Structure formats: structure tokens, C-alpha cells
Regions:
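RNA-contacting regions in translation and RNA-metabolism proteins
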Residues: 1-173
Length: 173
């Protein structure tokens, strides 16, 4: 994650030119969160997807919708993730709407979900704020597909999960 300053809006294509430590990058419309409004001079956090070499020099590919942005925000906010005590197993994101993040710890004494949410929800609240109010569900990861599926579908009450076919990853809930 890097901080970028909005330099110029492109109303024709919907993209945004930003400055990152003296270098320019272009945030494509497809990499912006629906509903977010940017103005020149805004400082925004972006995820660096990659850097490629072009005829005109290096090109920085950035995103506000990539699940990696959420992962890095959690690493910044939750020391247990940064230190490796808690592992982010998977992230499913519908940018601007909802994110589900599955977390796990080898140490049974660590409440991975509770640590990510933080006292009185303060840790996850900071991430929600950075993502413009996007809802975030932190769920406990399990190696048992039935348990993990039930947790991932929260807040819905799941009565039963039946694995129909391991190969095609199909189940009945």
C-alpha cells in the first residue's frame, strides 16, 4: 500500500492520474471503488499490483479494488497479522459493498477473529473507514470445509452443510 495524491481527473475515461513519491500512475476506472468520489489534491491509499517496463519507462499498476489492499490494511492495523501470529487465509471482496476475510492462528490461545476486530471493534473500524464504509466480516478459517462454509456464510444461520462433490467443490447448505 502506498499513499497517492490525486493530480488530475480524466472525465472522458473515468480514470485518475496520481502522484506516488514523485512518480505518476494512472488509476483505471475499473480499479476504483464504485461510489468513491475523488477530487484533485486528495490523498488516497492504493495497492500496487505491479510494475511493468514500457517504452516510456516503468508503469505502476495500482488498484483500490484489489483484495490485497484489504490484506495490507489488516497487516497495518493488526500487529498479530504483521508478526505472523495470525494468518489471512482468504479474502473475498465486492469492492465498495462487502469484504469477507478468513483468518486463522496456529496458537490456540489467540482469538484470530477477536484480534482482527479489536477492542470495541476499533481495529476493523479503522479499516472500514479507509474503505469508505465497506462492510467487513471477519470469519474463522477452518480446514473442515463444512465449518468454513458455515462461518463464511455468516451472519446467516446455517443448519447443515453437506459436501456433494469434493472435486467440483459443490455442496448443499
Amino acid at each position: 500500500i502506498v499513499s497517492a495524491r490525486v493530480m488530475k481527473l480524466d472525465p472522458r475515461r473515468g480514470g485518475i492520474t496520481v502522484e506516488i513519491d514523485g512518480s505518476e500512475a494512472y488509476l483505471l476506472k475499473s480499479e476504483q471503488v464504485p461510489g468513491e468520489i475523488y477530487t484533485e489534491g486528495d490523498i488516497i491509499k492504493v495497492y500496487v499490483v505491479g510494475v511493468s517496463e514500457t517504452d516510456r519507462g516503468p508503469r505502476i499498476m495500482i488498484s483500490r479494488t484489489h483484495p490485497g489492499l484489504v490484506k495490507r490494511l489488516f497487516e497495518n492495523e493488526v500487529p498479530e497479522i504483521y508478526d505472523g501470529l495470525i494468518e489471512v487465509k482468504s479474502i473475498s471482496r465486492e469492492a465498495g459493498s462487502r469484504t469477507k476475510i478468513a483468518v486463522w492462528s496456529k496458537d490456540e490461545n489467540i482469538d484470530a477473529v477477536g484480534a482482527c476486530i479489536g477492542p470495541k471493534g476499533i481495529r476493523v473500524a479503522k479499516i472500514v473507514e479507509e474503505l469508505g464504509g465497506e462492510k467487513i466480516d471477519v470469519v474463522k478459517y477452518s480446514e473442515e470445509p463444512e465449518q468454513f462454509i458455515a462461518a463464511a456464510l455468516s451472519p446467516a444461520d446455517v443448519l447443515e452443510v453437506t459436501i456433494l462433490d469434493e472435486e467440483s467443490h459443490s455442496c448443499r447448505v
